[in-house]
Amino acid sequence: MNALLTNPFKERLCKGEVQIGLWLSSTTAYMAEIAATSGYDWLLIDGEHAPNTIQDLYHQLQAVAPYASQPVIRPVEGSKPLIKQVLDIGAQTLLLPMVDTADQARQVVSATRYPPYGERGVGASVARAARWGRIENYMAQVNDSLCLLVQVESKTALDNLDKILDVQGIDGVFIGPADLSASLGYPDNAGHLEVQRIIETSIRRIRDAGKAAGFLAVAPDMAQQCLAWGANFVAVGVDTMLYSDALDQRLAMFKSGKNGPRIKGSY
């Protein structure tokens, strides 16, 4: 099987194109496939806060594979064994949470690369990513098709942002607004003016360094603002929030005193 590995999400990032995404937290392949038919450029399959197992992530990757929407996997943390598993099931783009230092960034880069460039364990014959050993020269191709994104979501990470941006192998940096605002002393208040100022300057620093800048904004005006600041991969909703708000809104049509949509914050 002489297949050439490609990653359309990474290719568009490298061109500086804007890509609009959706957060998937419902943990089901059925819901993931519905989202994939909607036309979002990318879909974040969340393994950090949503209760996804490695099998759940695998099934959702299978569900979205026939469609143009590109999957991005966020594991619960960036350990070498977990990164290996997620890559083996076929993830090509990873979003790794809580990367605070350049050393951590270098460690996760190493975990995604096969020797001699890194420490990823070899198991192509049992990996969906290599079509169970049927993709010729998989190990030689895969480094170029992998896309590695890291989350900056603490004051420590902000202090180290320039050093993180200098790490070779990091393709983009995602600003985590909820955790970042809490770390800065404004819990549950990503809309605070000081937090907004820091988000804007961080996005501009990321883009000036030649990296992609990402953000999650469930409020449309915040999403538009981040796009104006230069963010080029922006998630504009969370499936569970959209679902619960749609349910509440429909019920409010028929029962008095019921609340309408609640989408206001960042996550």
Curated annotation (Swiss-Prot):
Site (Transition state stabilizer): R74
MF terms (GO), sorted A to Z: 2-keto-3-deoxy-L-rhamnonate aldolase activity; magnesium ion binding
Keywords, alphabetical: Lyase, Magnesium, Metal-binding
Keyword Membrane in record: no
Pfam families per the UniProt record, alphabetical: HpcH_HpaI (PF03328)
Residue numbers marked as site, Increases basicity of active site His: D88
Enzyme Commission code: 4.1.2.53
Record has Lipid biosynthesis as a keyword: no
Top class in the EC scheme: lyase
GO CC annotation, single: cytoplasm
Active site: H49
Cofactor stoichiometry and binding remark: Binds 1 Mg(2+) ion per subunit.
Reactions listed under catalytic activity: 2-dehydro-3-deoxy-L-rhamnonate = (S)-lactaldehyde + pyruvate
Oligomeric and partner information: Homohexamer.
Listed NCBIfam families: PRK10128.1
Task of the protein: Catalyzes the reversible retro-aldol cleavage of 2-keto-3-deoxy-L-rhamnonate (KDR) to pyruvate and lactaldehyde.
Protein name per the record: 2-keto-3-deoxy-L-rhamnonate aldolase
Species: Shigella dysenteriae serotype 1 (strain Sd197)
